[in-house]
Amino acid sequence: MATELPHLIWIDCEMTGLSLEKDVLVEIAVLVTDSELNVIGDGIDLVIKATPEQLAGMNEFVTQMHTASGLITEIPNGITTEEAEDAILAYLQASGTQPGKSPLAGNSVSVDRNFIARDMSRLNEYLHYRTVDVSSIKELARRWYPKIYFAAPAKTGNHRALGDIQDSIEELKYYRSSIFIEAQIQGQNPPAEKVD
């Protein structure tokens, strides 16, 4: 009998930009799903305080994005990065995840992982080294299944971290039902567990 697969830890971050040299995290949201993409609990969405100088360093596009989403007005009342990391780790432990077992999931999540590795080392160590990146599946669908790609659900997250995660989960559910169709293999039982 196959063992139960670890949960997925979905993370989305909003930053002042994409540069690890100068930009900072200003929002992080986390949701946990089981391996069937069912959301476990309510998730957590945290705004992180940035200095006026850090906000002044944002380019026009990022400034407009965070203004339109309403995030810009919440940042001055945000919490510290350390407080955010503590809250996230407590949420993950309460959600039934175990250190080093659950992959990070999201859209273009390598960017988020770089900021997490820089600013939240305990969270980075808590995550499995593997990643489920929905944007990779989207790129493959665009090349190999364009009809499915163009019929994908529209995003509604409005560049807020929790909404973006919810969009990513819905997008992966869509690709799962449209592309990842279960094949029956005659005369073979799947192995109980694969080690790789």
Pin down the residues of each PLM region.
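Catalytic phosphate/metal-binding cores of nucleic-acid and nucleotide-processing enzymes, i.e., regions
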Residues: L25, N114, E139-W144, P191
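Conserved non-catalytic scaffold segment of RNase H-like nuclease domains
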Residues: A2-I11, M15-L104, P153, D196
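Active-site-proximal helix-loop-helix substrate-binding element of RNase H-like nuclease domains
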Residues: A50-E53, E60-T63, V134-E170
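A short alpha->loop->secondary-structure connector
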Residues: M120-T131
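Short, function-defining helix-loop hinge/capping sites that tune catalysis or transport
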Residues: L20-K22, D42, F115, A141, ...
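Short, glycine/charged-enriched secondary-structure capping and boundary segments
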Residues: V24-V26, R118-S121
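Residue-level signal for well-ordered alpha-helical scaffold segments within enzymatic catalytic domains
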Residues: E74, A87-A90, A94, N114, ...
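Acidic, Mg2+-coordinating catalytic module of metal-dependent nucleases/exonucleases
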Residues: P99-V109, N114-M120, K147-D196
